């Protein structure tokens, strides 16, 4: 089955869609007038998501969107693109009868910024089967997300599907004016998800780490002060010890010379 002519985009979370994103979304409609367009919001997300348990445990929009894009494509098929991707020309040529098309942001490195798939594609089925709730397996939240439902998961699964089409970086990530002339889209990397819930969560984590660092430094400061005080006390006690009379000291030095 081929990739159906549907463009999916997701906007979830408490904040309204920023103005630049509205223009980038419109660019996809402009270059694909005959295609169906779906902007998924909180109000029309799947009522019975396959990974409902995982979604319920995720609070950050970026985390939920990573899972939802897989599920939407598995159910409906089509092309998913992030809202900060600006379309430059039609996708018709790059799809060309394929049933799955991945996008590379670096040679051999797959991104989930844009994905095209036929409904029910086995790669997406496997990806959804491997999605786990975001428990604390990783210290770095970003790396945890990439592995659980993001680019690293796709990158690993693609190895078992050698026939899928992978677009080279210049198609969606042009780095020169010459590459842009032939690119399908350009990624503005607005990282808008990180301006809301994710940013607040990151700030809370940073505050906790800062508080731990402050506590550790305070403990070290107290230990240093106690050590300094103890050394001063020992030096004070040493100075209080009576010194032997001068004659006794001279006799001792003379004895040491004779011993040599």
Where is each model-derived feature located?
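Glycosyltransferase-associated regions of secretory-pathway enzymes
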Residues: 1-65, 81-260
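Small-residue hinge/turn detector
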Residues: 66-78
């Amino acid at each position: 089955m081929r990739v159906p002519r549907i463009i999916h985009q997701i906007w979830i979370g408490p904040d309204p869609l920023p103005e630049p994103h509205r223009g980038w979304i419109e660019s996809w409609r402009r270059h694909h007038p005959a295609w169906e367009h779906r902007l998924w919001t909180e109000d029309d997300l799947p009522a019975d998501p396959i990974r409902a348990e995982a979604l319920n445990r995720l609070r950050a929009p970026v985390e939920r969107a990573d899972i939802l894009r897989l599920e939407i494509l598995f159910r409906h098929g089509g092309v998913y693109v992030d809202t900060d991707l600006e379309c430059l020309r039609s996708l018709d040529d790059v799809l060309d009868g394929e049933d799955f098309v991945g996008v590379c942001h670096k040679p051999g490195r797959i991104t989930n910024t844009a994905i095209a798939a036929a409904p029910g594609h086995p790669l997406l089925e496997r990806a959804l089967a491997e999605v786990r709730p975001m428990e604390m397996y990783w210290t770095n939240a970003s790396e945890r997300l990439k592995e659980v439902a993001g680019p690293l998961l796709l990158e690993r699964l693609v190895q078992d599907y050698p026939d899928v089409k992978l677009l080279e970086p210049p198609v969606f990530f042009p780095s020169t004016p010459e590459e842009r002339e032939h690119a399908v889209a350009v990624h503005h990397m607005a990282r808008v998800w990180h301006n809301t819930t994710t940013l607040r969560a990151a700030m809370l984590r940073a505050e906790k780490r800062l508080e731990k660092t402050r506590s550790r430094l305070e403990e070290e400061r107290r230990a240093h002060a106690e050590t300094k005080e103890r050394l001063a006390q020992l030096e004070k006690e040493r100075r209080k010890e009576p010194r032997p009379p001068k004659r006794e000291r001279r006799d001792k030095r003379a004895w040491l010379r004779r011993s040599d």
